[in-house]
Amino acid sequence: MSKNSRLGTMMFLQYALWGAWLPVTARYLSAGVAEGGLGFSGSEIGMILGLAGSIGAVAAPFIAGQIADRYFSTERILAALVIIGGVVKWITAYQTDYSAWLVLSIIYSIVYMPTLALSNSITFAHMKDPDSDFPKIRVWGTIGWIAASWAFPMIWLQTDLNFQWMPPFIVGPEVANVTNRLADALIFSGVISVTYGLFCFMLPNTPPKKDAVEKLAFKKAFELFNQTSFTILVVASLTVSIIHQIYFLQTGPFLSSIGLKDSQIGPAMTVGQFAEIAAMAYLGFFLKRFGFRKVIFLGVLAYAARYAVFGTVTLPIWIMVVSQAFHGICYAFFFAGAYIYVDKIADEDVRHSAQTVFGMIILGGGPVIGGWLSGYLQETFTQAGLFDYSLFWYTLSAVGFVTALFFGFMFREQVEKRTAA
């Protein structure tokens, strides 16, 4: 097995274990006990999926950068973390108490979030031509997410599969206890995690770095706030990361409320990952042709457009499913474009720290604020036990639209002002 093939398999498993559980968990947590779910409130779900993610994002740089990079071979610490994470996910699947879910989700986030950086670190350490090789290897992560999101319902939630023209294309009658079985997505993720952990021992050896990380790197990275473009980007990114988090908190329950079967939620949401593959493939072209400001602006505007479609709840289900394609534009044009811009304006000796600072702000702050806001808006727009999804999504669309205008008018590229390291 070639080195690039092993790295591609690593990415496949890295994101497959995530795609196995994230799209359907909110639906399982929000469904009533009589339906087979846990009946948690919007605020509780926001804490489970929001606060946990934020804590993990803040802890990740310490675990990945200060411990893994210095004292252990990267592939071995990666193996340990994903195996521990798999066990935690398996245990979580059997819990019905909110407190247990919250604690276990925080533990899982602390061990899983660092693996995102570690898998990237291994990949970059063994590529001859990163600009050419990384997109080809990273795309297997998206494919892994799609594969897991499709495999679980086809194997465990449906019978007598048949082909249909609308995503998720391959469907069949649902099993009787389909909502209750959504919890098994966590077990499925746990199995993938343990498999991934064992596979890590087949990865190329990536020894710890002998040189200490420059202590002033973080201080220098924070000096990027002296550049107006970086400050504007961070403000817009924090806002976008908030409404981005709410997508994963509410889309599953929303699709169920308009008539999509529980077994079809995960596959339907992968329309966004298919679009992501295409958007990432052409991201370089768009950046060269239109520049960072216009591309990132379109990424933010895609959030407003997607939530506007969701808010028009009278539209057919197939339009709601197809509109998931906006997710690919949202992620590639905004998040990938933003990370590339940060890399461009940071001095070479602080690039890693700059990305870490940027990531901590949007991945640390966004999920916890998004989790709280999702619960608050759900309670605000619920009258007589009925949740008005239309007002909910239109509110988020307005936030996205205002953010797009703010970014479009205020942001000016400053790549040329970067000084040499």
Regions from the PLM with identified roles:
Residues 154-191, 376-400:
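A membrane-interface helix-boundary motif in multi-pass transporters
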Residues 79, 83-97, 301-315, 408:
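C-terminal ends and interior cores of transmembrane alpha-helices
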Residues 68-82, 288-300:
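Cytoplasmic membrane-interface "Motif A"-like loop-to-helix N-cap segments
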Residues 6, 92-93, 192-204, 392-421:
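Multi-pass alpha-helical transporter architecture, strongest
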Residues 1, 174, 200-237, 257:
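Juxtamembrane intracellular "pre-TM" segments in multi-pass secondary transporters
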Residues 1-55, 229-270, 335:
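Helix-loop boundary and gating motifs at the non-cytosolic
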Residues 46-66, 270-282:
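Central cavity-lining transmembrane alpha-helices of secondary-active solute carriers
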Residues 12, 88-118, 122, 238, ...:
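Hydrophobic core of transmembrane alpha-helices in multi-pass small-molecule transporters
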